[in-house]
Amino acid sequence: MRCPYCQSEDTQVKDSRPAEDGAVIRRRRVCSVCGGRFTTFERVQLRDLMVVKKSGRRVPFDRDKLTRSIEVALRKRDVDSERVERAISGIVRQLESAGEAEVTSDEIGRLAMDALKGIDDIAYIRFASVYRNFSKAVDFHNVIDELTVSETGDNLET
């Protein structure tokens, strides 16, 4: 594994343990050249997924892009990073175990919103504003109403 600080390939594993309920191996590493310490994660990849964008373009699924999107929504929110990582792993497992070689960007966004709804309301609203392409203040009001209805268990069809 290459050191992220000095790019040396001379690194050693100092600690290795299961994480995320055994779905991931967390390794603590140290660089023999610069002494830098860093953590890596090893996880099973069931299949190579292709994402079908709204434009019809196909690109390889990028777990890191999903992670960055969710982290942007969670910025400055007091949420346990382990909980976020479990949510991201859950989304990826759902996508991989669906048995499809392709998944739409809309499906990924919907799964991310579902996960965020259970983690943090503010992050859910932030993510929704980008995913649903909000253009007016009423769009925010509508998603807040959705959250309020789902939290109280009210049914709009009365």
Curated annotation (Swiss-Prot):
Recorded GO MF terms: ATP binding; DNA binding; zinc ion binding
Q: Which residues form a coiled coil?
A: none
What the record notes about the co-factor is: Binds 1 zinc ion.
Tell me where in this chain the ATP-cone domain is found. Answer: 49-139
Name what cofactor the protein needs.
Zn(2+)
Q: Which UniProt keywords apply?
A: ATP-binding, DNA-binding, Metal-binding, Nucleotide-binding, Repressor, Transcription, Transcription regulation, Zinc, Zinc-finger
| A single GO BP | negative regulation of DNA-templated transcription
The molecule here is called Transcriptional repressor NrdR
Family to which the UniProt record says this protein belongs: Belongs to the NrdR family.
* Pfam families membership: ATP-cone (PF03477), Zn_ribbon_NrdR (PF22811)
Q: Which domain of life is it from?
A: Bacteria
The function of this protein is: Negatively regulates transcription of bacterial ribonucleotide reductase nrd genes and operons by binding to NrdR-boxes.
* HAMAP family assigned: NrdR (MF_00440)
